[in-house]
């Protein structure tokens, strides 16, 4: 067991030759398949775990993941809003099976700093889960009462101009507030974020159609959305 960000525990699991891992020896619970069919909304596997860390610690933790687990930097972001900003360094495992983005505030009032105050330290900001059909998944989750972050209407008005020939149903995206990013070369990515679910922690639902990024074009939109909520709540103030 290793100590990770914010005192979290990272468990290293043995592989037992051809027999696999210790999880392969677990007994199945009777009726699990029926329960899964009844309760599933189409979520599949963990895509990434985004962490918020204190100012000056992003490079420390990216170095930790690099030296201990051989993770490499996949992407670096410098995001600025109306009054605040953040740096983000996305790390990826050698087999590309898991990604660990690390966020660090550029100032004392950003959403990263607010998270650290509410969470009482560094920790996971959001958990991203994959789906093969984001429309059906989000509609099923909404029907069960899950609330998602909103996006300004002009975002959807500009999709066809920003990504010509994307082939997605913009009206259904608008109805569900689903974001899109990508290119002809890299493929597409569809994503949406829930409201805070456990304290300041929220979830991301993501469908990858060849794109291995993080919705680079949407990162700014997400930051702006959360910053706008901070302004509305009086956490930060901007000149009129």
Which stretches of residues belong to each language-model region?
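Glyoxalase I/VOC metalloenzyme domain signal
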Residues: 1-73, 82-240
């Amino acid at each position: 067991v290793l100590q990770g960000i914010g005192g979290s525990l990272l468990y290293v699991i043995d592989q037992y030759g051809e027999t696999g891992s210790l999880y392969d020896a677990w007994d199945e619970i009777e009726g699990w398949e029926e329960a899964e069919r009844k309760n599933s909304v189409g979520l599949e596997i963990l895509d990434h775990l985004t962490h918020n860390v204190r100012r000056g610690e992003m490079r420390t933790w990216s170095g930790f993941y690099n030296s201990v687990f051989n993770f490499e930097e996949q992407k670096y972001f410098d995001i600025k809003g109306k009054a605040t900003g953040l740096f983000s360094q996305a790390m990826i495992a050698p087999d590309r099976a898991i990604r660990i983005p690390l966020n660090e505030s550029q100032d004392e009032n950003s959403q990263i700093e607010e998270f650290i105050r509410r969470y009482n330290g560094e920790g996971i900001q959001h958990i991203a889960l994959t789906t093969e059909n984001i429309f059906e998944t989000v509609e099923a989750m909404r029907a069960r009462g899950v609330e998602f972050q909103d996006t300004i209407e002009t975002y959807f008005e500009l999709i066809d101009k920003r990504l010509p020939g994307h082939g997605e149903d913009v009206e259904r995206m608008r109805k569900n507030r689903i974001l899109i990013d990508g290119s002809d070369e890299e493929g597409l990515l569809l994503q949406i974020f829930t409201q805070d679910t456990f304290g300041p922690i929220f979830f991301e639902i993501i469908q990858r159609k060849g794109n291995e990024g993080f919705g680079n074009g949407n990162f700014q939109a997400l930051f702006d959305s959360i910053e706008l909520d901070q302004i509305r709540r009086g956490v930060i103030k901007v000149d009129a």
